[in-house]
A protein has these predicted regions:
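Conserved alpha-helix/loop element of class I SAM-dependent methyltransferases that forms part
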Residues: 113-130
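N-terminal auxiliary segments of SAM/dcSAM-dependent transferases
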Residues: 1-93
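Conserved class I S-adenosyl-L-methionine
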Residues: 129-140
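Class I S-adenosyl-L-methionine
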Residues: 241-278
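S-adenosyl-L-methionine
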Residues: 158-197
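Conserved SAM-binding loop of SAM-dependent methyltransferases across substrates and taxa
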Residues: 140-152
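Conserved beta-strand signature within the Rossmann-like core of class I S-adenosyl-L-methionine
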Residues: 232-240
């Protein structure tokens, strides 16, 4: 179950700060409890710590690259991770805004840039102001957040994975599902068939890797995207930069070729393809 709205989030950084402050016999500590969105003052005690009128135990066991949330039902901090058919995990970054992993595969860039700032640059490519936008694979919502900040008229965002939606409910960097952002739990390959022709001004397509969701790279899906997109509308398709020598595939060029066959002009930009409907 999702945590309460005022649940603190901890990483190894904050936990180590708490232990160091306790060892130094400090009374208070300034630290972040929301993945660097803000700073809070907590009270440091010998056996627990206090924040917002509540007391919490010190997590005695913790790992790097893990976000911990307070689970009231367990009376303990638990990893922000779920396992169903795959392991889905929220992963902290040095930038504050987290990425996430599915079975150990990182879903958002974070090695050289904040995944939140990376989303800003990609959303700028489709020029969101006053547009109706389809966000095919909502993920943690960073594309949607920047569309809203960029003045989009309406953002229709799809996310099929309930585990990802649960992570999104925990993540303070994820936007609220409130107008002009509409978040729908549905398979976008099915949903797109029901959308009206020429009903969107721009599209953001950030699918999982080809090996996980090949249907989101298919010519038939791209043709549906072309159908619902108005003429001269923009589509940004994230492909990543897979090593074609080790993977045996040149995914960006394969994507660009299929998009052209679907009726787009294409240009490779960074780790994706910017396409314009002819």
């Amino acid at each position: 179950m999702p945590p309460a709205p005022r649940t603190p989030l901890l990483t190894s950084k904050e936990i180590e700060q708490m232990f160091n402050s306790r060892e130094a016999r400090a009374v208070t500590l300034e630290c972040s409890l929301d993945l660097q969105v803000s700073t809070s003052t907590i009270e440091i005690g010998p056996i627990d710590w206090a924040w917002d009128g509540r007391r919490f135990p010190y997590p005695e066991r913790f790992k790097e690259r893990t976000v911990y949330y307070w689970a009231d039902a367990d009376g303990a901090f638990q990893p922000a991770a779920l396992f169903s058919s795959s392991l889905i995990k929220l992963v902290p970054t040095e930038w504050g805004a987290p990425t996430f992993e599915i079975d150990g595969i990182k879903m958002l860039p974070s090695a050289k840039i904040s995944p939140f700032e990376d989303a800003q640059a990609k959303v700028a490519l489709i020029q969101p102001k006053n547009k109706t936008i389809l966000d095919t694979c909502g993920g943690l919502g960073y594309f949607g957040a920047w569309c809203v900040r960029g003045g989009a008229r309406h953002v229709q965002s799809y996310e099929v994975n309930s585990g990802v939606l649960w992570l999104r409910s925990i993540n303070p960097w994820s936007p609220a599902a409130a107008p002009p952002l509409r978040l729908i739990q549905e398979d976008v390959t099915r949903a797109v068939i029901t959308l009206d022709t020429g009903s969107v001004d721009a599209i953001l397509h950030d699918p999982p890797r080809f090996g996980i969701a090949g249907e989101l790279y298919s010519l038939s899906f791209y043709r549906q995207l072309a159908r619902i997109l108005r003429r001269r509308g923009r589509l940004f398709h994230y492909t990543g930069t897979p090593n074609k020598l080790t993977s045996g595939r040149d995914v960006p060029n394969e994507v660009a070729k299929r998009l052209r066959n679907a009726g787009f002009a294409t240009e490779k930009i960074g780790d994706g393809i910017l396409a314009v409907k002819k």
